[in-house]
Amino acid sequence: MTATLERRESASLWGRFCDWVTSTENRLYIGWFGVVMIPTLLTATSVFIIAFIAAPPVDIDGIREPVSGSLLYGNNIISGAIVPTSAAIGLHFYPIWEAASVDEWLYNGGPYELIVLHFFLGICCYMGREWELSYRLGMRPWIAVAYSAPVAAATAVFLIYPIGQGSFSDGMPLGISGTFNFMIVFQAEHNILMHPFHMLGVAGVFGGSLFSAMHGSLVTSSLIRETTENESANAGYKFGQEEETYNIVAAHGYFGRLIFQYASFNNSRSLHFFLAAWPVVGIWFTALGISTMAFNLNGFNFNQSVVDSQGRVINTWADIINRANLGMEVMHERNAHNFPLDLASVEAPSVNG
């Protein structure tokens, strides 16, 4: 009898926990994805803050020349970063217990792997939580689909690119100047500016910004006035009201006369689908481009491709970009190698003795 009561008590306790996790009445929805998301994102955030402030220098290139990234070791907010895991570790899974000591783990950049892997799990679970809440509320799943674009971008630079290059040391540093360094080196090694998928991503981001600004300004300029001229137009509305707050026909007419008729939408659903799809598809393409360049399927290279009838090179902007790429490549990791591979004219001598 006692065992039966205990089983019922535990079952009801588990049932109450399940109801609480999946309840849409909570101020913040938890969800089953949230059960994983909360600890992983808290871990990533906590380790990031501690490491950004106090982590010792990391031997990123695996050549016993550690690079400082934390505030206590001479950096500021702009120059500081979580330095990627050492090239000596490569793609090995490197938790704290795999190192001989905590000092060794810090020296080899263990915090970077810890942060990136927990962050990746966290953002994937956040995307799943968006779908889960939409499902509970009877909504369509497109919010999670839109969020998949930044998830794909983060996955590309933090996971796919290091896997393709063979080491977490090639991942993007977690800091402002570290991000810029990653971008410059990426251009030098992969000519990303000449990759069509990057061009689509630029069109997606800048186009999305332009369309959002146009949409917001058109909506706020075509509000349906519910007040007198002596009162603010904002006083005529309440949050969540069923009636429309702006006149899409007026906005459509204005924009159609400003550009041409078919440049504007007269259907609200089509308009908002376009506003969502344009930047999302652009960022999807950028993430796909990073993922292909991770395996050295690089941007277009027109190096010395234009010649005259005598065989002399006619320099183009593409040649100038290539020269800039070579200059950037010889500047980075200057002590890890003597020359970049594409500047070496002969094979390296044997070191077997």
From Swiss-Prot:
The keyword Electron transport applies. It comes from the Eukaryota. [CaMn4O5] cluster binds at D170, E189, H332, E333, D342, A344. Chlorophyll a ChlzD1 binds at H118. The chain crosses the membrane at residues 29-46, 118-133, 142-156, 197-218, 274-288. The record marks H190 as: Stabilizes free radical intermediate. The gene is psbA. The keyword Metal-binding applies. It is found in: Plastid, Chloroplast thylakoid membrane. The lineage of its organism: Eukaryota, Viridiplantae, Streptophyta, Coleochaetophyceae, Coleochaetales. Residues 345-353 form a propeptide. A quinone binds at H215, S264, F265. The modification N-acetylthreonine is found at T2. Tyr-161 forms a radical intermediate that is referred to as redox-active TyrZ, YZ or Y-Z. C-terminally processed by CTPA; processing is essential to allow assembly of the oxygen-evolving complex and thus photosynthetic growth. Photosystem II (PSII) is a light-driven water:plastoquinone oxidoreductase that uses light energy to abstract electrons from H(2)O, generating O(2) and a proton gradient subsequently used for ATP formation. It consists of a core antenna complex that captures photons, and an electron transfer chain that converts photonic excitation into a charge separation. The D1/D2 (PsbA/PsbD) reaction center heterodimer binds P680, the primary electron donor of PSII as well as several subsequent electron acceptors. Its EC number is 1.10.3.9. PSII is composed of 1 copy each of membrane proteins PsbA, PsbB, PsbC, PsbD, PsbE, PsbF, PsbH, PsbI, PsbJ, PsbK, PsbL, PsbM, PsbT, PsbX, PsbY, PsbZ, Psb30/Ycf12, at least 3 peripheral proteins of the oxygen-evolving complex and a large number of cofactors. It forms dimeric complexes. Gene3D superfamilies: Photosystem II protein D1-like. GO terms for cellular component: chloroplast thylakoid membrane; photosystem II. The record marks Y161 as: Tyrosine radical intermediate. Fe cation binds at H215, H272. GO terms for biological process: photosynthetic electron transport in photosystem II; response to herbicide. Belongs to the reaction center PufL/M/PsbA/D family. It catalyses: 2 a plastoquinone + 4 hnu + 2 H2O = 2 a plastoquinol + O2. This is Photosystem II protein D1.
